[in-house]
Amino acid sequence: MFHKAEGIVIRTVDYGESNKIVTVFTREYGKIALMARGAKRPKSRLTAVTQLFTYGMMMFQKNAGLGTLTQGEIIQSFREVRNDLFRASYVSYVTDLTNKLTEDEKRNPYLFELLYQTIHYMNEGMDPDVLTRIFEVKMFTVAGIKPELDQCVSCRSTDVPVGFSIKEAGFLCKRCIEKDPHAYKITAQVAKLLRLFYHFDLQRLGTISLKPETKATLKTIIHQYYDEYSGLHLKSRRFLDQLESMGFHDQSTD
């Protein structure tokens, strides 16, 4: 049976001399794996649409196991992302996270839209670091590890949080901060941003500019939380960290 779906290529693996197996996150079917025969040949009609990060309309035959991609049409190639090592590294991490945290053929139109908007904004030159933090926070629920971001995880107070506890999995108010001596001390702004990143609609994102120290705090907390609860150890994240430590930056800000 033949099917048609909008999808973003989140992983590719060479198969034989001329074929590819592509993992596509689709709006209609969730994550699917497709054999793209001949896609490695330069003149193949499947070459362009099976490039990593490409957003396209995919026509495929669904089999018992691996499906077969028969035709594709590019909707958006995200050229600016693919031509910039730094931004491409952020998108690699975002797509890697999507791949690792989702099951095959589990439809999730919300997640598809989140993935698309994240890559789209990066392609438009918006801060990839901030976009990645937003994506990570929104993926807490998909990973099944959402922390308490609406009240104190200990006493349920809605007072302004003064700490984030990895151990307790959420915010701590000033009365409960001593319950975890290892809790991160946070400002009201950091607490507000973590809550905002989780709840707001990414399509409504305007211009957002954060101080380097604020971004560093958010990254540390979010990554420590993932390390503690997700069980993931992604090469794409390590590579991105290495680029940052070597002084690489987003060329769109030059």
UniProtKB/Swiss-Prot annotation:
Gene3D superfamilies: Nucleic acid-binding proteins, Recombination protein O, C-terminal domain. SUPFAM superfamilies: ArfGap/RecO-like zinc finger, Nucleic acid-binding proteins. Pfam families: RecO_C (PF02565), RecO_N (PF11967). One of its GO terms (biological process) is double-strand break repair. Keywords: DNA damage, DNA recombination, DNA repair. It comes from the Bacteria. InterPro entries: ARFGAP/RecO, DNA_rep/recomb_RecO_N, NA-bd_OB-fold, RecO, RecO_C. The keyword DNA damage applies. GO terms for cellular component: bacterial nucleoid. Belongs to the RecO family. Involved in DNA repair and RecF pathway recombination. PANTHER family: DNA REPAIR PROTEIN RECO. HAMAP family: RecO. This is DNA repair protein RecO.
